UniProtKB/Swiss-Prot annotation:
Amino acids binding ATP: 100-124, 148-171
Region listing for Interaction with NAE1, in residue ranges: 242-248, 292-295
Regulation of activity: Binding of TP53BP2 to the regulatory subunit NAE1 decreases activity.
Subunit relationships: Heterodimer of UBA3 and NAE1. Interacts with NEDD8, UBE2F and UBE2M. Binds ESR1 and ESR2 with bound steroid ligand. Interacts with TBATA.
Reactions the enzyme catalyzes: ATP + [NEDD8 protein] + [E1 NEDD8-activating enzyme]-L-cysteine = AMP + diphosphate + [E1 NEDD8-activating enzyme]-S-[NEDD8 protein]-yl-L-cysteine
Name under which the protein is recorded: NEDD8-activating enzyme E1 catalytic subunit
Annotated segments matching region Interaction with UBE2M core domain: 368-462
Organism of derivation: Rattus norvegicus
Entry keyword set: Acetylation, ATP-binding, Cell cycle, Ligase, Nucleotide-binding, Ubl conjugation pathway
Amino acid sequence: MADGEEPEKKRRRIEELLAEKMAVDGGCGDTGDWEGRWNHVKKFLERSGPFTHPDFEPSTESLQFLLDTCKVLVIGAGGLGCELLKNLALSGFRQIHVIDMDTIDVSNLNRQFLFRPKDVGRPKAEVAAEFLNDRVPNCNVVPHFNKIQDFNDTFYRQFHIIVCGLDSIIARRWINGMLISLLNYEDGVLDPSSIVPLIDGGTEGFKGNARVILPGMTACIECTLELYPPQVNFPMCTIASMPRLPEHCIEYVRMLQWPKEQPFGDGVPLDGDDPEHIQWIFQKSVERASQYNIRGVTYRLTQGVVKRIIPAVASTNAVIAAVCATEVFKIATSAYIPLNNYLVFNDVDGLYTYTFEAERKENCPACSQLPQNIQFSPSAKLQEVLDYLTNSASLQMKSPAITATLEGKNRTLYLQSVTSIEERTRPNLSKTLKELGLVDGQELAVADVTTPQTVLFKLHFT
């Protein structure tokens, strides 16, 4: 092929060569396979080696399971998700579902390679599925332009493996809770067939991590919640009266000016995916920054602060996605021992990787199957319990709803998410636990957006 050929001619020539290869090798009709297509996978599945699982027996059945049966769910179709989808599709996985609630922004195009400029504004899940179904013969990627909370346990139970490429701790905690809720126990013994393995990957700049979670058997997300850094929040006094950073100006407009001015109508919430909303925040932030001689407010920074965007580097995404896809392959085929169970990656200065076994917490609120013990004085106010649930490093709840059984009736002590109930139960926050009728050994049921399950707490008076 001459070096001077235009890219379009090169592309057509490559397509012609591929068509010729399929004709010579002998295509397999409507299957989309040709001789030698899966040779790179067969090397791992049809022969043994020094790293294969001791109980693994090479055969053709494992490849057929990948091609025909194994169903994988990918959560997230962003920078990490695009890499994951590509890796899985090219590794023989054909039954893939993908969930993503976001639409494509022009800033995504530099690293989320399944998208093109013409796709801006369209759902990521749908475009990613279209691209892979068109590019990879016989691959069936099913898109879901939804939140993960839109699906019930029946939906998640159909998958053999779930792999996450999320940028949200809340979403991770929710899917973790969902998979734990799928577990079945017989006389206290876990039924292995009810386990849906979770492979979780995350990146931030030049750092990343990947982990293998076998719900009910290994450490879950809640067991290691302290490993996730808390969200950065700026003091309100600094934002309002002494801004020093461009982020302070953006947060001021987001938290104070937007609710006050309601620029798009009464009750219209700020939507980080709406360009008009971001533009309004950006303009107002520039105005406030000029009042304090602060430089550096840009549209991209505004979008990042409003949406809590995590810095992304394409090469880090590629490394972590490769690790996650490898773990999916190992678990699906049982050909190799999976990661046990946490890997960290860092290439800020040189290249560093490390693996260790994250341990289960005996009193994990998600996977221990035991009520959590909490200690308070009878004179403590319900507000103190609420503060504990939200501020505790091991719980980090967002908007806990507290209920208890009193005199044989289920009573809501506080519920924040419904305005009418919040107003009715707000006076309870200033009451003591004794005044509310709670007793030593009382069980409190707490619901929160971080988990689909209700978490039980046992109250002990001190």
